[in-house]
């Protein structure tokens, strides 16, 4: 039931005194008082709609990337409310992690206090944007009432065999002094957070078996038709499913010693001239000969200092040393040397590859560098020619120099050789994945404690659920000197085993913060549940999320982990769906104007550039490059949202950021365009000011009653045109806000409608004008919610504009009495004529032939052919 809203006697503004701060603050208070943004209890048969932005890390400072993300989601949420849906639009905070811990170390403060302070600051900044967020559902991952359930879910995964601990070679960040998952190491071998070159270390770590879901994660991408193709491709490539064969090479002279390699090209087995192990392969130590021991040890030490990118870069030389062992090629009995090389990685496949230099580029480069044999076994198709000596032939073809398999095509040979090897026990078909199990251990303080106890007698023991949450100790030393800070807190570490009662100790690693963000969308549906993380029936009503909005940089981190979590929880019968997000919108970056000195790579503050038309470095005088790049402090190109809102208001900021570029494209910040949106809103104010209802029995009529049944039989031409423009706008904007969302073109349609109404409201009946303004204000409400509310009040609308129904097209208003018909002569456009909209082909032919255009251009000739495209053109061919 709608509560009373301010009457028309309440304050309203004209363009002459438009004060956006006063207006927006007033309406935000009113919305809060009315509780308009709370998630309603859905009525019977009412459709639910879940709109969600990727929740932010609470840095304490809102940036324009945040603004774009949250405003896009807010528009979608507001539209769906007006369409009659029960809408869930929550917000929370991804609040654990290294930045807060590092800030706490630098400032000697508690990271919890620091984080809560930042949350309060950012919430106040978000409130200024007029976002229709249900703050009653707010969650922060660092709060005990949230991470209790992260621990509960970890124990569910542990009980299902999906969480385990093992010794592993891990990615160590020497700056942040913690372990990183593979996904958190960039293509240059650097930490995604600190930028440090990542090192390799052996540590006992906790993992989640995401690889158990590799096939489901890649196969189900086909069902995500509401996701950008680019994101689906990135995930498929990261999972990296390859079909091939495992080949067993027996080590010569060593009983029961086998080197197993995975290859996608078993057809090239006859061309193998060596086998290569990763330097970290467990057999390197035992198979290295005494003569090669020093060289192998030195090489392994060298490789341990290199990043993955350095080891696998195509433009780098391929380095390696022989270890002094030989293996036997099972298909032909040849003896092949065993090497170690930088380009073979321990965590891909078996950590061993067969070198086939004639048909693999890396093997070719390696063989040329180390004078190893290059044997061609695949001939180019449909030719007697082999590949050029200067490169490997990696394509398909026909087998040669392959014994009984000569003449087979590549695909035939893959099957035949694998089948033959399987019959002899040295080969089997195999599917291999690039994806590795998710490493979740972190050796830092500010994270969710892993709810595990280690007992000398009982082994790994889960913390009983009734003892959750395992809370972080407070007031501890956060020196940042390596290792887990909580490992030094003996009073916290030492506990009794829940099973045997003997002395035991807690797990001192904390969880990767992506654990917390892999399920938060579920908690929003049931945020106050004190018995479970969520109720299955409730989440099944609201989820999957209908529209998820966030950056593409999360394609193979958060989005992949969230999909895994959803599938795992489904299999534990905790939820009834297998994918978390039905539709995904990945908004582009907000870029700022940047001045860069190309000679030295330095960035120059715009404040130091005296002439925009000829920008120069103030010190060197060098001409500067003018670029648009992602906003950052180091590039002096950031724009503070608070400054923009203080000057122009939230509605202007929203309109600019939505209009400037399609949501999935990068947006170039332009102060002049911000000013342009401010002027447009002022024009709307003047338009609304130009209309006034007549007095009726001392009362102002209401625009709500103007949802109006309009008799189209006796409308004037002006009225027909106004109704057509109004309903064309409904049609276009509704289309723009459905499916692939195009917010920029929706605002463009708003501008068209505004222009078509300007100066014409007094030329039509009040009912027609009121209908047009009612539609205009409702269409603009999701974009500029404060001004729309003000307009609705001024036009005597009942209740809030945001409680009104989305406008519906009147098809009769779109019917044209006449249309414009193009006249062509010999295919060239010669003019246009007006014809009845329902004219048949015969009528169109007569009208075209009798037109002045035809008389002029046919010059008395009769056309041999007449081509008619109804509703578009007539082509006369003499």
Swiss-Prot record:
Gene source species: Prochlorococcus marinus (strain MIT 9313)
Residues involved in ATP binding: 633
Gene3D superfamilies xrefs: HUPs, Isoleucyl-tRNA Synthetase, Domain 1
Domain of life: Bacteria
InterPro entries: aa-tRNA-synth_I_CS, aa-tRNA-synth_Ia, Leu-tRNA-ligase, Leu_tRNA-synth_edit, M/V/L/I-tRNA-synth_anticd-bd, Methionyl/Leucyl_tRNA_Synth, Rossmann-like_a/b/a_fold, tRNAsynth_Ia_anticodon-bd
Protein name, UniProt field: Leucine--tRNA ligase
One cellular component (GO) term of this entry: cytosol
Enzyme Commission code: 6.1.1.4
Keywords (A to Z) from UniProt: Aminoacyl-tRNA synthetase, ATP-binding, Cytoplasm, Ligase, Nucleotide-binding, Protein biosynthesis
Predominant subcellular localization, coarse grouping: cytoplasm
